[in-house]
Amino acid sequence: MHPEVSEQQADGATEPSLEESAGDHSGAGPGVRKEEINETKETCVGPSTTSCQSQKQQSGDSRLDCRSGYARNDRDDRGPRMTKEFLQKLCKQHKLYITPALNDTLYLHFKGFDRIENLEEYTGLRCLWLECNGIQRIENLQAQSELRCLFLQVNLLHKIENLEPLQKLDALNLSNNYIKTIENLSCLPVLNTLQMAHNRLETVADIQHLRECLRLCVLDLSHNMLSDPEILSVLESMPCLRVLNLMGNPVTKHIPNYRRTVTVRLKQLTYLDDRPVFPKDRACAEAWARGGYAAEKEERLQWESREHKKITDSLEALAMIKRRAEERKKARDKGETPLPDSEESSSTSPEAQDKPPLGETQQKIEVLVEESFKAKDELFPEKPGGEEELAVVADRTMEEPDLPGSLAQSQTPLVATAEESTSSVAATDGTGIEDTEAIALENKERLFIDDLPDLEDVDGMDISMEDQTKETGIPKIQVISSLSDDSDPELNDSPLPMLEHTPTGSTGVLSNIFAVCKDSSKAARVPLTDIYEPRATTAPETQGQVFSTTPPRPLIQELEEDGRGENESKQSLPAQSSEDGDSQLPEATLLGDRAENEAQSSLDLGKPSPRASLEDIEFGLD
């Protein structure tokens, strides 16, 4: 519909109204009518001319210019910008560093950015996420020289460019873009992974640049429009290619026996499309390339037989382990020593394993026996010959097969006789276990007869005679108090070797006697119950001898000779009775009765000679 026709229709439509209005206004002049008509024409023509101009602008190239201008204005005014303030706020939101250079990762995906900008301060970035934005060009990455990973998938990129500053880039993701040619990647010397899925790659020339990417190991070309089988020649020239994805391309249908062919031609390939390339698959593919399907079938059977043999061997090994465990368990239940495994028994025999412990045990035994004989020679220099006895003991231990039992049997008399200083070495003498046991029994019997053999060498020690008599005389005073008056003392039955080294003066003897009397009341029951009663069960004859060797008569004679000792005894008896209470009164009365009876007998006998008095004193101390 043309503008002139519309103007005529508009004029025709307005003329009747004007005539009517003129009829209504018959009183108005013709000049007024013309002016009103002109005004209405101007008002009617104005909008039509503007609409015509707008229609002309919409036609042709001017229409595209208007659209691009409007898009630029909307993008500049309405779209989000990658400003410094926005980046700082984003770092704070993701709890990153406020200082830009300290950040190594920046998450800018799903933000709607249309360009890369204001990243000059982020010099330490190693990973940059720009996924799912509206970016149309790769730019402004000069400051990111440390970048390792760049994710630009799902954007509006049409070309690969401006990647020269990224000399350390390892992974580049350009999937879901509009890229038609792979280019400008040879400037990345360490590029390892390239993802180009869902792009516009079609021919061999589009991927020819991959020949220059010598370090590329992972390549994803899935869901493109590659259809020429010659792309395999380009992929063969990549020496480090390990992972390849060609799914979604027409070329997979154009290559016969696609998987076998690609596996054979790409020698280093370990993963193709959606699954790995196993050694068995590669061997079968190579067999197919040599002899067809028959060779492939034969190779597959060989691999299956080897795998089956491996499984059966493992099962047999498990069964063998189980059987050996059961045998060892049965032997252990029977009390037998379980035999070692066949491999261990072939390499090292049980005799060879037992030799080192046997030698070590023998050495220890010899050292122990030698030390014991040295100690014996030091104590008894008049009995040499320890070396000969050592040789005898060594020969005996060599002949005995059961070492632990012999050691246990030989250690028993040693412990039994270790209570005596002089008899500890004597237990190790002899040529057999029976001799040592006999010596131990003799020592036990002599222990109750000679009660104080250990105190023969006490002269060099710093122990007073009063303390010595306290230790040795307490049980004897208790026995004296427990004896009856009509007991017959046997003075010549047991000599006392302790008195050989005691002083013979009356003062020293009396002091020892009364020192014993002072301490006898305090420990009257303990020695009787703990020492003499257990020994009475083992050696009843010796107990009677000990009891009979304590006559009261010499004690009373000495008391008559020295009045001072009598006074001390009188003072000690009340003190003991007062301290011990009523429990000690019977002993005091017994001593008083004995004193009276023995005083009467001493008057009848008369005063003895000094020699007899000394002998009586020795027997009285017993």
Curated annotation (Swiss-Prot):
| Residues where Phosphoserine is found | S349, S464, S487
List GO BP terms, alphabetically.
axoneme assembly; cilium assembly
Sequence intervals crossing the membrane: none
Region Disordered, annotated ranges:
1-80, 326-360, 399-431, 480-503, 525-622
> Which residue ranges have biased composition labelled Low complexity?
48-59, 337-351, 415-428
LRR repeat spans: 101-123, 124-145, 146-167, 168-189, 190-211, 215-236
Under the heading PROSITE patterns, the entry gives:
LRR (PS51450)
Its cellular-component GO annotations read:
axoneme
Localization of this protein = Cell projection, Cilium
**Residue ranges with Polar residues bias:** 1-11, 539-550
The record places domain LRRCT at 249-288
Give one Pfam hit by family name.
LRR_9
Entry keyword set: Cell projection, Cilium, Leucine-rich repeat, Phosphoprotein, Repeat
Point to the regions of Basic and acidic residues compositional bias: 32-42, 62-80, 326-336
Gene Ontology MF annotations: dynein complex binding
Q: Which InterPro entries match?
A: Cilia_flagella_integrity, Leu-rich_rpt, LRR_dom_sf
Q: What is its main location?
A: other
Family named by the database record: Belongs to the DNAAF1 family.
General function of this protein:
Cilium-specific protein required for the stability of the ciliary architecture. Plays a role in cytoplasmic preassembly of dynein arms. Involved in regulation of microtubule-based cilia and actin-based brush border microvilli.
Name under which the protein is recorded = Dynein axonemal assembly factor 1
Give the source species: Peromyscus polionotus
